[in-house]
């Protein structure tokens, strides 16, 4: 599409809006991704205003968990406002028929998320709450606890002492007879620590209308049966003392009856709010979508399409720039859906930008990440050269198998073209590619000591394996479980609105009288929930023509028989992993594979063997080659 100057491109509207995408990065294949763009636009332009009108005309709150379940059983009717009519006129006929039926009110009816399909109350159990830290949608936050009480890394000159207030008295009775020192020594204590991540932003976040968020620490104990149990949750809010932002902290421990049982449910909910926000902004958007862009750009700018590294990486870039452009125009833009629904709101992008300053490419490799978090140790005798300290850690167990398969494929492929380090060092295109990745794509981090020098074949193998892992398996792990786990928002609320009820308060009295209502009034409001859930349903679906890891959409991608054979072996390894995943999910000893919700962990099931679209839709299984949604 040329403008006044034939040598220049103009932007394609309406889908990518004002975010420029190079011509060869636009969706060139007429596939479900095209409908995705229209669907997101329809959500923002039509359905969101209709939801807002519905909430304004109704009481504006869910009354109970049963009231929320009506979303999946009969749906709710949204008013037929002019914005919906405008969407009907502007968008493709088939999409309009499927998404916004002609005439009358628009029925917002959602499929029942997997987390409540088998048991509508399983999400409330401590076991499921903890299991999702190992097999949920954000299973890369948990760390092994190495000191007690947990310490803070916040600058004491600005924040004072933020050492945790959790004591042995809080957790001692929950350690199966061990002392804290013994539990630490035996690798039995773990933590999901959001305190330092969020505390610097909480003053601003809690100054927003209708927002009250805590910085949380969740302490977990590895039980003898291999499952985790939450033993304490610390809720901290900022306390300004002179020039210092100190913390006011309260520790909650498990209770399962009466009003104290509901206080514990709320403590878990506040921790889940932290997890939801971090997942959306950091684990998902930043650490998969955003970080791929410098590699996509440098590869297209510096490597010819016939270069072996281009051929290796290109399938893992498919549609990424385009979907990111749509996200910037519709989702993460100022006032967009993410700011509407996720607790940092207008502070979301500043927060993710701040986190990016500490990003380290070498730590994105799964084994390195697990070792850094203390979840694994190096072990040359183990199949993947690292040994998990929690054996039944589904994300890590499946992830290591997939990582190893990727690494082996990359090794087999690259050693065809780089038999020694000298050949690599003499490859001018490759060296220019890596120079741009480091010095242009990451100009602010170019002097970091951790960057590979790209002097050895081993460095290239690790770098390419990390890029492929990020664009395929890591994104699959954090994306396709969004609706299955968070589509029922009491399980994964995106925001909290008021502090923990204190005895004698009106809120505490409501918690005693109508606990579900009090819980609902504390978490994500109705408007945020309806918009957020509608978005997650769109983003969690596999398309009908998905290309999965170990598959290729261009059979003639290379004429090199050795490369073709190496790729065939890669596919065979992935199909072997599929069988392993199914077998582990059926092993009753591995309790974290399915949990109380009876929802088997399949997010890292490769789905390489599927050539007929069996994983289409909200199946929560399959690893696409690239970030295309």
Q: How would you name each of these model-derived features?
A:
Residues 1-629:
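Long, compositionally biased charged/polar stretches
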């Amino acid at each position: 599409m040329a403008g006044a100057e034939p040598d220049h491109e103009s932007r394609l509207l309406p889908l990518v809006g004002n975010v420029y995408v190079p011509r060869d990065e636009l969706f060139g294949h007429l596939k479900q991704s095209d409908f995705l763009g229209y669907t997101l636009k329809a959500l923002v332009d039509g359905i969101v205003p209709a939801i807002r009108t519905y909430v304004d005309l109704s009481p504006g709150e869910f009354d109970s968990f049963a009231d929320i379940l009506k979303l999946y059983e009969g749906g709710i009717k949204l008013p037929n406002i002019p914005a919906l009519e405008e969407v009907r006129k502007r968008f493709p006929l088939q999409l309009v028929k499927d998404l916004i039926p002609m005439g009358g009110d628009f029925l917002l009816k959602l499929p029942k998320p997997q987390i409540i399909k088998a048991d509508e109350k399983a999400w409330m159990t401590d076991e499921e709450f903890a299991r999702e830290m190992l097999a949920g949608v954000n299973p890369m936050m948990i760390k092994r606890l190495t000191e007690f009480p947990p310490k803070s890394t916040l600058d004491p000159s600005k924040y004072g002492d933020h050492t945790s207030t959790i004591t042995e008295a809080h957790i001692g009775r929950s350690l199966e007879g061990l002392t804290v020192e013994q539990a630490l020594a035996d690798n039995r204590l773990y933590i999901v620590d959001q305190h330092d991540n969020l505390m610097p932003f909480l003053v601003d976040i809690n100054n927003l209308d209708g927002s009250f968020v805590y910085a949380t620490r969740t302490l977990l104990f590895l039980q003898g049966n291999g499952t985790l149990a939450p033993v304490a949750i610390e809720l901290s809010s900022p306390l300004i003392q002179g020039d210092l932002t100190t913390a006011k902290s309260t520790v909650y421990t498990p209770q399962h009856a009466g009003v104290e049982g509901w206080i514990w449910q709320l403590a878990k909910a506040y921790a889940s709010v932290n997890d939801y926000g971090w997942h959306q902004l950091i684990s998902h958007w930043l650490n998969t979508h955003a970080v791929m862009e410098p590699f996509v750009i440098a590869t297209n700018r510096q490597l010819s399409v016939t270069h072996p590294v281009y051929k290796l990486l290109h399938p893992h870039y498919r549609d990424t720039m385009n979907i990111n452009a749509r996200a910037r125009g519709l989702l993460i833009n100022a006032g967009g859906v993410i700011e509407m629904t996720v607790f940092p709101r207008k502070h979301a992008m500043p927060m993710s930008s701040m986190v990016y300053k500490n990003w380290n490419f070498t730590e994105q490799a799964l084994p390195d990440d697990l070792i850094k978090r203390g979840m694994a140790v190096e072990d040359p005798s183990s199949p993947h050269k690292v040994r998990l300290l929690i054996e039944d850690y589904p994300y890590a167990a499946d992830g290591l198998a997939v990582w190893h398969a990727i690494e082996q494929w990359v090794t087999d492929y690259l050693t065809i073209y780089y038999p020694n380090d000298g050949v690599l060092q003499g490859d001018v295109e490759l060296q220019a590619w890596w120079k741009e990745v480091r010095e242009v794509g990451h100009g602010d981090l170019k002097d970091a000591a951790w960057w590979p020098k790209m002097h050895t074949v081993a460095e290239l193998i690790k770098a390419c394996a990390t890029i492929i892992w990020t664009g395929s398996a890591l994104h699959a792990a954090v994306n396709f479980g969004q609706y299955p786990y968070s589509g029922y928002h009491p399980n994964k609320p995106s925001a909290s609105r008021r502090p923990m009820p204190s005895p004698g308060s009106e809120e505490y009295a409501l918690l005693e009288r109508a606990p579900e209502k009090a819980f609902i009034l504390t978490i994500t409001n109705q408007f945020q929930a309806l918009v957020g859930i509608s978005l997650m349903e769109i983003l969690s679906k596999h398309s009908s023509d998905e290309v999965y890891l170990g598959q290729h959409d261009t059979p003639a991608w290379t004429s090199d028989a050795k490369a073709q054979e190496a790729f065939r072996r890669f596919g065979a390894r992935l199909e072997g992993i599929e069988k392993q995943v199914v077998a582990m999910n059926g092993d009753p000893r591995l309790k974290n594979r399915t949990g109380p919700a009876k929802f088997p962990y399949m997010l890292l099931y490769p789905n390489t063997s599927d050539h007929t679209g069996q994983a289409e839709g909200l199946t929560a299984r399959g690893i696409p080659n690239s970030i295309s949604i």
